[in-house]
């Protein structure tokens, strides 16, 4: 379990993902550490979004799951109001947690409302977004190499 303040949970989540994902050479020298098998920028944006925009009225944790073929980041709660997957891909946003969103600009690598999903997709074009209304959760799936 990753618990604590939002900045410590953010750092803990990224640390967990980086420790448990492969690093690949991608043409680098033999002795280099290599690059993460998926976009680190996309992971940062998705983890940040999951902490900032999750539904805190749901008594459920954010889940970070690593499978052989994919990574899943699951946030409690569906997209708020009339927000859709297509809309967030275009930068549309609805603030669910006003106080957390306002502090995110100061405590995280927050780049502005509505820009995170666009940036994640630009850096990891094959990621998939699911607004699971039955399970009341938002799921991001990132295929692995």
Feature locations, PLM:
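Helix-loop-beta hinge of the Bergerat
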Residues: 1-36
């Amino acid at each position: 379990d990753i618990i604590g303040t939002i900045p410590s949970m953010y750092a803990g989540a990224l640390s967990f993902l980086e420790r448990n994902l492969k690093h690949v050479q991608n043409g680098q020298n033999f002795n280099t550490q290599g690059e993460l098998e998926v976009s680190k920028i996309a992971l940062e944006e998705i983890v940040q979004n999951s902490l900032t925009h999750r539904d805190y009225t749901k008594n459920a944790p954010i889940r970070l799951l690593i499978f052989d073929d994919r990574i899943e980041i699951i946030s409690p709660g569906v997209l708020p109001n009339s927000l859709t997957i297509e809309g967030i891909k275009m930068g549309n946003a609805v603030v669910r947690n006003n106080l957390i969103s306002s502090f995110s600009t100061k405590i995280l690598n927050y780049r502005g409302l509505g820009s995170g999903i666009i940036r994640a997709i630009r850096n990891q074009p094959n990621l998939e977004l699911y607004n699971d209304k039955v399970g009341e959760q938002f799921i991001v799936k990132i295929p692995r190499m």
